[in-house]
């Protein structure tokens, strides 16, 4: 599996840059591997030697809690040496470019770089120029967040068994959401129907194009009226309002957004009786989603966080280890 191959110096490294180039079979392979990693997390001793001797660097140019920590935990459970590197306090503060930082890490013998960056395409840049290092995209600008989309797909599949024929409603700030872009690819490749809902000002123009490329998205419908969009939904995913990425003028008022697009118990009454509720986090509780729903019986939000560790274990394992046997670490 993997999204892109780089062949150099006799190596064949694979990168996870986005979901759009993954086939359905590749996605299913990742989700199956995630299930195996979930079993590891249920063991009394949560440690396996699969990546012993491998060096993983988490290189984050943006703040993160869930993604960074889950990657670090995933690497350590697999017995890799994990180095946490942020832009502050490093040579980046002195003006070093991303590429030069990557080349330095490659020269040090790093095996995997997990990169979060404010500029779209930054992981692709490293993948192109670092033949000896595997790159995993942990979120780049407004472009993509493949690991979040894959863990969300796994979370739904673990509940329903399949996404085929399901109606999934994604609500909120789609325009600024890299999660939504990757989720649309993941969910539709697995057979789900996607409905987007939110203010027209927060819906991207030209939904059938991704970053101007000729990659046509599978059918996606837009229904600004959330009460209409949610009818018969199997899954409802709320997106965070990306205040740090907005220049203002997208919403008439926060009160209006809450009134029209907050996920509430009353609104969910028109969805499927078994509807599941998700949020990729961080969550503005009481804005995108009511407290009652966020912590209610239909919420998968905590499971998303738990599954994030297993999914990232699976990705680190697949880009680093190939066919190594997952065995339990004995003290």
Model-derived features: where do they sit?
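Positively charged, low-complexity intrinsically disordered leader regions
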Residues: 1-73
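Rossmann-like adenosine-cofactor binding region
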Residues: 208, 212-292
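A short helix->loop->beta-strand "cap" motif at the edges of active sites that frequently abuts
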Residues: 131-133, 191-192, 270-276
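Adenosine-phosphate binding glycine-rich loop
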Residues: 274-275, 280-331
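Phosphate-coordination loops involved in phosphoryl transfer and adenosine-cofactor binding
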Residues: 51-56, 164-168, 274
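Glycine-rich phosphate/diphosphate-binding loop of Rossmann-like nucleotide-binding domains
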Residues: 61-73, 153, 158-239
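Phosphate/diphosphate ligand-binding glycine-rich loop within oxidoreductases
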Residues: 45-154, 285
């Amino acid at each position: 599996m993997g999204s892109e191959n780089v062949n150099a110096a006799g190596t064949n490294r694979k990168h996870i840059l986005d979901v759009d180039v993954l086939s359905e079979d590749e996605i299913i392979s990742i989700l199956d591997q995630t299930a195996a990693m979930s079993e590891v997390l249920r063991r009394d001793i949560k440690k396996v030697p699969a990546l012993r001797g491998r060096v993983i660097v988490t290189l984050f140019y943006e703040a993160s809690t869930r993604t960074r920590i889950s990657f670090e935990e995933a690497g350590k459970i697999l017995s890799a040496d994990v180095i946490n590197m942020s832009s502050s306090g490093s040579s980046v503060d002195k003006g070093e470019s991303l590429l030069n930082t990557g080349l330095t890490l490659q020269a040090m013998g790093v095996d995997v770089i997990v990169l979060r960056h404010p500029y779209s395409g930054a992981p692709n840049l490293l993948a192109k120029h670092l033949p000896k290092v595997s790159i995993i995209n942990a979120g780049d600008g407004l472009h993509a967040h493949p690991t979040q989309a894959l863990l969300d797909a796994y979370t739904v599949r673990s509940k329903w068994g399949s996404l085929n024929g399901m109606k999934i409603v994604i609500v909120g700030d789609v325009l600024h959401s890299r999660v939504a872009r990757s989720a649309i690819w993941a969910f539709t490749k697995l057979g789900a129907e996607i409905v987007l809902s939110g203010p027209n000002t927060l819906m991207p123009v030209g939904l059938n194009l991704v970053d101007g490329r000729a990659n046509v998205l599978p059918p996606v419908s837009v229904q600004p009226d959330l009460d209409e969009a949610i009818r018969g939904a199997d899954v409802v995913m709320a997106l965070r309002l990306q205040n740090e990425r907005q220049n203002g003028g997208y919403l008439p008022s926060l009160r209006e957004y809450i009134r029209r697009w907050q996920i509430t118990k009353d609104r969910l009454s028109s969805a499927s009786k078994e509807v599941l509720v998700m949020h990729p986090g961080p969550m503005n509780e009481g804005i995108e989603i009511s407290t009652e729903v966020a912590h209610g019986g239909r919420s998968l939000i905590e499971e998303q966080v738990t599954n994030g560790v297993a999914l990232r274990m699976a990705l680190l394992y697949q880009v680093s280890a190939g066919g190594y046997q997952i065995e339990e670490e004995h003290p």
